[in-house]
């Protein structure tokens, strides 16, 4: 059987940063942020060439070990076969190892680009299959769901398959991220979590996660109580004490703040009136960035955009 046909023209994919957990929504809730990696992929006659600019340009591999390349290969297998060669250009703006979904962005960029460059790819790999594939590669759906769908997402596993719904966050919310200079490996942060937690803590988080859906979509004034967490942040504090100290300081000032994903970035959910002031609160050692909310998720764009 003949393999798939590929487009001669390059495709450009833009993928957003994401913040998972958002306090109580451990491994379930995700928010898409207006900070992007751009990837251009072109089918070539032979070989694999990867060019990287920006974040990770000095450390990321430029061969088949690159997560983007591995994700492309996995998607091409599902689409019916591999191209003879690939040229990949990455413009990375999402910090690596900081809890802003850089690995999910690479995975989503790879599988979306593979579908886009394959003629008839949409019919072979629909959006549901994209989410399932991204989750299979990443290991959990919270970041990849937000990266693919944009907005505010709730994801879960059902019968071994990833599922997600997208909601529209309140447009008055202005995310502010505080990025430290030192990375924390996701594996390190996950390794600090206990095998079990007290029932009272699990019950409290369930209530707060439910409240957070209402707060993020309709009633931002409830974000401070809605972002309270008992399941993971305190357990991870030994790996990121400065981050937890900043979260506690911001919350004491009435600002909804959480560890972003597995950390160590801190995410504050401000509004237009307070965002600039909030961004100045971190002090030395932090890169504070006021961001927008992303509504599009992973997108195929014109090369000149």
From Swiss-Prot:
Q: Which cysteines are joined by disulfide bonds?
A: none
Query: Which PROSITE patterns does the entry link to?
Result: GHMP_KINASES_ATP
Q: Name one GO biological process term.
A: threonine biosynthetic process
InterPro entries, A to Z: GHMP_kinase_C_dom (IPR013750), GHMP_kinase_C_sf (IPR036554), GHMP_kinase_N_dom (IPR006204), GHMP_knse_ATP-bd_CS (IPR006203), Homoserine_kinase (IPR000870), Ribosomal_Su5_D2-typ_SF (IPR020568), Ribsml_uS5_D2-typ_fold_subgr (IPR014721)
A GO cellular component annotated for this chain's UniProt record is: cytoplasm
Q: What are the binding positions for ATP in this chain? A: 95-105
Q: Which reaction does it catalyse?
A: L-homoserine + ATP = O-phospho-L-homoserine + ADP + H(+)
Kindly tell me the pathway this chain contributes to: Amino-acid biosynthesis; L-threonine biosynthesis; L-threonine from L-aspartate: step 4/5
Instruction: Give the family this protein belongs to, as stated in its UniProt record.
Output: Belongs to the GHMP kinase family. Homoserine kinase subfamily.
Identify this protein by name: Homoserine kinase
Q: Which lineage do the record's taxonomy fields give for this organism?
A: Bacteria, Bacillati, Actinomycetota, Actinomycetes, Kitasatosporales
Q: Which gene encodes it?
A: thrB
């Amino acid at each position: 059987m003949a393999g798939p046909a590929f487009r001669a023209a390059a495709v450009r994919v833009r993928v957003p940063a994401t913040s998972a957990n958002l306090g109580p929504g451990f491994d379930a809730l995700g928010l898409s942020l207006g900070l992007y990696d751009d990837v251009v992929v072109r089918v070539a006659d032979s070989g694999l060439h990867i060019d990287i600019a920006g974040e990770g340009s000095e450390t990321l591999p430029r061969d088949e070990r690159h997560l983007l390349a591995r994700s492309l290969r996995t998607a091409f297998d599902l689409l019916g076969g591999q191209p003879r060669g690939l040229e990949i250009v990455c413009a990375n703006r999402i910090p690596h190892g900081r809890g802003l979904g850089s690995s999910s962005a690479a995975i989503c960029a790879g599988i979306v680009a593979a579908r886009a460059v394959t003629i008839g790819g949409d019919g072979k790999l629909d959006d549901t299959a994209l989410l399932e594939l991204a989750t299979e590669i990443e290991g959990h759906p919270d970041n990849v769901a937000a990266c693919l769908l944009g907005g505010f997402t709730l994801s879960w596993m059902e019968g071994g398959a990833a599922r997600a719904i997208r909601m529209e966050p309140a447009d008055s919310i202005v995310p502010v991220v505080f990025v430290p200079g030192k990375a924390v490996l996701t594996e390190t942060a996950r390794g600090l979590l206990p095998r079990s937690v007290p029932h009272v803590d699990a019950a409290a988080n369930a209530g707060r996660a439910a409240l957070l859906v209402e707060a993020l979509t309709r009633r931002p004034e409830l974000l401070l109580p809605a972002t309270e967490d008992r399941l993971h942040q305190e357990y991870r504090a030994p790996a990121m004490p400065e981050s937890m100290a900043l979260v506690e300081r911001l919350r004491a000032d009435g600002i909804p703040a959480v560890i972003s994903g597995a950390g160590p970035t801190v995410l504050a959910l401000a509004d237009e009136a307070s965002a600039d002031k909030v961004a100045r609160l971190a002090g030395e050692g932090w890169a504070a960035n006021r961001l927008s909310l992303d509504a599009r998720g992973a997108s195929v764009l014109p090369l000149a955009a």
